[in-house]
From Swiss-Prot:
The gene is ilvC. Residues 2-182 form the KARI N-terminal Rossmann domain. Binds 2 magnesium ions per subunit. PANTHER family: KETOL-ACID REDUCTOISOMERASE, MITOCHONDRIAL. It catalyses: (2R)-2,3-dihydroxy-3-methylbutanoate + NADP(+) = (2S)-2-acetolactate + NADPH + H(+); (2R,3R)-2,3-dihydroxy-3-methylpentanoate + NADP(+) = (S)-2-ethyl-2-hydroxy-3-oxobutanoate + NADPH + H(+). It comes from Prochlorococcus marinus (strain MIT 9215). This is Ketol-acid reductoisomerase (NADP(+)). Involved in the biosynthesis of branched-chain amino acids (BCAA). Catalyzes an alkyl-migration followed by a ketol-acid reduction of (S)-2-acetolactate (S2AL) to yield (R)-2,3-dihydroxy-isovalerate. In the isomerase reaction, S2AL is rearranged via a Mg-dependent methyl migration to produce 3-hydroxy-3-methyl-2-ketobutyrate (HMKB). In the reductase reaction, this 2-ketoacid undergoes a metal-dependent reduction by NADPH to yield (R)-2,3-dihydroxy-isovalerate.
């Protein structure tokens, strides 16, 4: 069985006397910076001039510099910017400030896996990737818990990159829950596949198609919303807590029987073949190439699809229902 590492496996003192620059102060940047700060680390933040996040970082008690200045001052650089912005920022602001002994780190392997960023051989290159959104990483840390994380070493110039990555994971609270070792290739490919085939692409289309099927058959849109979107969380929470078996133990026999006999009518060998094609596009770089080209053109297709999806009936119905849910306010 795959080994998980915990607090006793990581040495936080390895980060003593190191200045850690968090590049970006969004969801993950905010969580990493404050968790490391609360763990006793010397943390600074690197932001572009005029960033809306600057006032928040300052009010949180952090020193803010330009990205270039932060990277010059830092021993450890953690890039927490959107994937599509990392290459340009790296080339202009980060790479010129890399020196022997510095550590370059990421929370997702996209830019390393697909060769968009090519670090010099004299720095360590590691990844620490919490498996949860930034607000959860922060909230769990503040409550004495942690969010599981992945860690990986792409380049070990110092000979200590693995131990350093584990120390960083401890600093943000990851080892409280357990951290799992991987590599940049595996993390990137599985993360992209999960997003596209299951978590975002697959689930979104499944929910919309279910909603449309009921509405087109004459059922109330509000009931279709409840059955095909709202209750997804109830089922997923059961899965997360105890797997598919516990979920099935918690639902009615009617629902469980329907699960077995109808599920494979939707998700079958043909679906799996399409999943394999999606995975191949990720593995051979097709998806990355298309995404980079889309971003270079200022995201015209993505903008069009975002607008089209925002006008779907499920969004209008959901907005109206959620406004009446006291527990969501």
């Amino acid at each position: 069985m795959t080994q998980l590492f915990y607090d006793t496996d990581a040495d936080l003192s390895l980060l003593n006397n190191k200045t850690i620059a968090i590049i970006g102060y969004g969801s993950q940047g905010h969580a990493h910076a404050l968790n490391l700060k609360d763990s006793g680390m010397d943390v600074i933040v690197g932001l572009y001039k005029g960033s809306k996040s600057e006032s928040k970082a300052v009010s949180d008690g952090l020193q803010v510099f330009s990205v270039s200045e932060a990277c010059e001052k830092a021993d450890w650089i953690m890039i927490l910017l959107p994937d599509e912005f990392q290459k340009d920022v790296y080339l202009k602001e980060i790479e010129p400030n890399l020196k022997e002994g510095k550590i370059l780190s990421f929370a997702h392997g996209f830019n390393i896996r697909f060769g968009l960023i090519k670090p010099p051989s004299f720095v360590d290159v590691v990844m620490i990737a919490p498996k949860g959104p930034g607000h959860t990483v922060r909230w769990e840390y503040q409550n004495g818990q942690g969010v599981p994380a992945l860690f990986a070493v792409e380049q070990d110039s110092s000979g200590s990159a693995r131990s350093l990555a584990m120390a960083y994971a401890k600093g943000i609270g990851g080892t409280r829950a357990g951290i799992l070792e991987t590599n940049f290739k595996e993390e990137t490919e599985t993360d992209l596949f999960g997003e596209q085939a299951v978590l975002c692409g697959g689930l979104s289309e499944l929910v919309k198609s279910g909603f449309e099927t009921l509405v087109e058959a004459g059922y109330q849109p509000e009931l279709a919303y409840f059955e095909c979107l709202h209750e997804v969380k109830l089922i997923v929470d059961l899965m997360v807590k105890g797997g598919l078996s516990q979920m099935r133990d918690s639902i009615s026999n009617t629902a469980e029987y329907g699960d077995y006999v109808s599920g494979k009518r939707l998700i079958n060998s043909d679906t799996k073949k399409e999943m394999q094609k999606i995975l191949k596009d990720i593995q051979d770089g097709t998806f990355a190439k298309n995404f980079v080209e889309e971003c270079d053109k200022n995201k015209p297709l993505m903008t069009k699809l975002r607008e089209e999806n925002s006008k779907h009936e499920i969004e209008k119905v959901g907005k109206g229902l959620r406004s009446m849910f006291s527990w969501l306010k």
